[in-house]
Amino acid sequence: MRQYTSKSILFMTAIALSACSHLPQTTSQGATVVSAQTVTQALGVDLASLEQKATALKPFEYIHNQDHYIAYLSTQPELIKVQKNGQLAKFFYQAGKVSFVQDKTGVYQFNQSGDVIAAIDANGKKQHANPADSKALWHKASQLQKLFGYNKADASAGRVKTGSDAKVNYLCIAKIQQVAQTNRVFRSPENAVVTENQIKATVRLNGNQYYNMDCQLSGDKVSKLSLMKK
């Protein structure tokens, strides 16, 4: 295996992707508890309309083992859905700032400083949010925003002139580095296949974490990425 850092991404050999049509979808089992009507009545905000508007944007799906993330992006994330351990959480952003978080415990509204200014519990009743818990939730939302926003590779992909194989490789490896928060990405050249917008291969992260990787492009952006532990 060979190591690839962000400086040598363009020189990696091809890895290939299978279509990710098998990616799990959010289901009613993972639905958040508070209804949209209750949120509107309690907080005066139509989250359903915000969600509908966001989901019309370009999506990026990320699967890490059993965890499923979908980010909807304009120039940056507007909505990130996280399905983990059978629970669904939604993170809303406005003008690049965390605005609302909806999870199994309720709905939380944030100001631009990251403070909760209003909250309701799972029953739709107004509640006083614990400051420490609220700050932790804000930090989580901010971290997700960094993990699933566009990166430098997304911005520069159009300048890659060494062929379509190099571009798909460049974008997919850069996205792995972003979501896994590591430059230590290794891959085996064996059985790796590449097309113009798909790659699939075995990858090794951080020296000892082996995954089956699937990646798919839509235009000059990664639209789906799956890392399944071997």
From Swiss-Prot:
Instruction: Supply the source organism for this entry.
Output: Pasteurella multocida (strain Pm70)
**Does the entry feature the keyword Signal, yes or no?**
yes
Highest rank taxon of the organism: Bacteria
Q: PROSITE patterns, from UniProt?
A: PROKAR_LIPOPROTEIN
Q: Which residues form the signal peptide?
A: 1-18
**Designated name of the protein:** Uncharacterized protein PM0674
Sorted alphabetically, the keyword list is: Signal
